[in-house]
């Protein structure tokens, strides 16, 4: 029966998606490879090498003897991913286009193309991730009717599919999948979920996929390529000159081309200064970038943030969080960073306060806080508000010691607000 199952696999021209397609073929499925063109390389002198990637994906299909299709989502990528990327930077935030690409392009545009145009029973990608469904359960989703209307039949049981971390914890990519819809996840297979990167390379070497094995792994944002992020952004955004200001004594240390070019935690390259300074705050009104002199300066550390309305993989918040309004779990805001123990506080509007057990370095507006409970990725929310830094709190304590009559009920950030 499995020989009749049709799986459409996204091919990037890299080793991971190539081996994913190979493994699906080995399982006896009817496999179709699809290459997505998401960026117009003609505008960027081929920075992303999209044409070469497409050729490599086509060659994979030839080696595996499977059909090849190419689709263009350049317009959709520009509207749903790149425009948001620029808008977020212009607001002084630090966006993650990879998360939005998976949400809007790979698991929406590509997913619907595979199912509606190619008649796929399931889709597959080369991501290092797992779900709570076995392959055969994924295929059964094709015949599971989605609830109609605003209210679900209370007798209908439709258990949500869980997004689980990959066996290779270092390569795990659930961070980038934390905004994927439940409907798309139900029909998705991740063939590499139980494998290590080294084993994937070994499979490629043993199956004549040398042309993708020899390619360097793509890192960073595709449409930027090897270029400097600041130079790239200034091609699209107007410069807004401002000052670098010391957070400790308000000394002006230098000038910059735009406060939106800097992310909290990064090193600020200030002309004429030999010692390193780091971005700790940004003042969009004045255009100033506040900096501190040490990589471990307390102004870099915070333990409180608030997100926008959280996208839960299961479509609804965990039952414990709904019941108690608070829940212990873990989160991260950068791929591959260590998971941070935290407490979530659920607000009525679906946003959450995140209180880290220990202050973390480099939290920035616009980043995604991705939540985990054990091996399960619960979902994510965009960071829209930050609590005070450890440096600000310390200054407040010092002022209180000097002026004990000062009120301790001054307004500020609090998880209940």
From Swiss-Prot:
Q: What else is known?
A: During the reaction, ATP is used to activate the C2 atom of U34 by adenylation. After this, the persulfide sulfur on the catalytic cysteine is transferred to the C2 atom of the wobble base (U34) of mitochondrial tRNA(Lys), tRNA(Glu) and tRNA(Gln). The reaction probably involves hydrogen sulfide that is generated from the persulfide intermediate and that acts as a nucleophile towards the activated C2 atom on U34. Subsequently, a transient disulfide bond is formed between the two active site cysteine residues.
Q: Indicate the family of this protein.
A: Belongs to the MnmA/TRMU family.
Q: In which tissues is it expressed?
A: Widely expressed but most abundant in tissues with high metabolic rate including heart, liver and brain. Expression is low in spleen, testis, lung and skeletal muscle. Also expressed in inner ear.
Q: List the disulfide bonds.
A: 101-222
Name of the protein this chain belongs to: Mitochondrial tRNA-specific 2-thiouridylase 1
Where is this chain's protein located in or outside the cell?
Answer: Mitochondrion
Q: Where are the active-site residues found? A: 101, 222
- Please name the GO terms that the record assigns under molecular function: ATP binding; tRNA binding; tRNA-5-taurinomethyluridine 2-sulfurtransferase
The membrane-spanning stretches of this chain are none
Q: What is this protein's function? A: Catalyzes the 2-thiolation of uridine at the wobble position (U34) of mitochondrial tRNA(Lys), tRNA(Glu) and tRNA(Gln). Required for the formation of 5-taurinomethyl-2-thiouridine (tm5s2U) of mitochondrial tRNA(Lys), tRNA(Glu), and tRNA(Gln) at the wobble position. ATP is required to activate the C2 atom of the wobble base.
Taking the first listed entry, what is the main subcellular location of this protein, grouped into a coarse class?
mitochondrion
Query: Which residues of the sequence carry a binding annotation for ATP?
Result: 10-17, 36, 126
EC assignment: the record states 2.8.1.14
Which stretches does the entry tag as region Interaction with tRNA? 171-173, 334-335
Site entry (Interaction with tRNA), positions: 127, 267, 367
Q: Where is this region: Interaction with target base in tRNA?
A: 96-98
Catalyzed chemical reaction(s): 5-taurinomethyluridine(34) in tRNA + S-sulfanyl-L-cysteinyl-[protein] + AH2 + ATP = 5-taurinomethyl-2-thiouridine(34) in tRNA + L-cysteinyl-[protein] + A + AMP + diphosphate + H(+)
- Positions of region (Disordered): 397-417
- For bias kind Polar residues, which ranges apply? 407-417
User: GO terms for biological process?
Assistant: tRNA processing
Q: Which InterPro entries match?
A: MnmA-like (IPR004506), MnmA-like_C (IPR046885), MnmA-like_central (IPR046884), MnmA-like_central_sf (IPR023382), Rossmann-like_a/b/a_fold (IPR014729)
Q: Does the keyword Disulfide bond apply?
A: yes
Q: Name one GO cellular component term.
A: mitochondrion
Keywords annotated in UniProt: ATP-binding, Disulfide bond, Mitochondrion, Nucleotide-binding, RNA-binding, Transferase, tRNA processing, tRNA-binding
